[in-house]
Amino acid sequence: MTKIVASLCDGMSCGHLALDRLNHTDIEYQAFEIDKYAEAVSRYAYPNAIRHGDARNWTNLIGKDVYLLMGGFPCQPYSVAGKGKADGDERDLSDLIFDALRGLKPKYFLFENVPMKKEQELRITMGISEALGTEEFCEPIMINSADFSAHNRKRLYWTNIPIEEWEDKGIVLKDIVEDGMVDRDKAYCVDANYFKGGSMKMYYEKSRRQLVFDTKGCHQVGEADLKGYDIIKRVYATSGKSPALTTMQGGWRQPKIATDELHWRNLTPLECERLQTVPDYYTSYGLFVEWGWCKPISNSQRYKMLGNGWTINVITHILEGMKDV
């Protein structure tokens, strides 16, 4: 029997990717998305999905037997990094989520958002619980993608799917980079603004926008006795020579490794796909309705949709708890 899956704020169809990994072939996927680039990537990957555009069109499914309702409603109204206006932000769709849950009465549901202020979290918890018509609170569970990928990404998940305990998969950042060197096991969270690029100042002072370092063919020959991040302790040699360690005043930000020059770069879109455990090159192409053919997706749009997306390994683990999968 075909199962109806409704994905609000579908993005690039991360939910479908997770269902694929569970060998779900008997689904009718109903997608709601307005971002044309993310929708194009989804359309290219899943041409048979039924598309409704705006999530407010969830009413199109009233009367249907919805098996799974899921969605990652916009995080900007709740993000600690943003203004955090919550339901006072015009981008907030939490009430829509409550209405859809109440109106469609799915067998299973899964909603996701960023960690937020406790009063905002409670409001969403109460809204979902009231929509379900139950006196028991549907408390969210916090999961860090770091246990499932090389990516530090804490998210809240509200669901009625039983979630089993899990173990760290042991995936680290060096496992997913194409080339270069990294100074930590887990990447900083990649968000929708990653396309704007990072800098050493932002990286070390604000712990944002993961960088990859290029030592121009250097190999590590030891560590200097310095306090601070590993990246400033390493001593390298090039062409068989060990340059003297440069000493500068100014604390941990100033001492550098003993190469003539340390180069850095941002993560590539491919590496961001791997952080989100999305298949390699999944976001490379999209099928655009207005042109009627496939076109490459720009790096900036790839970064954006990956930053807005889900970690597929996490979603797969959650959906495994559906008893009849």
Predicted regions and their residues:
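Class I SAM-dependent methyltransferase "Motif I" SAM/SAH-binding loop
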Residues: L8-S13
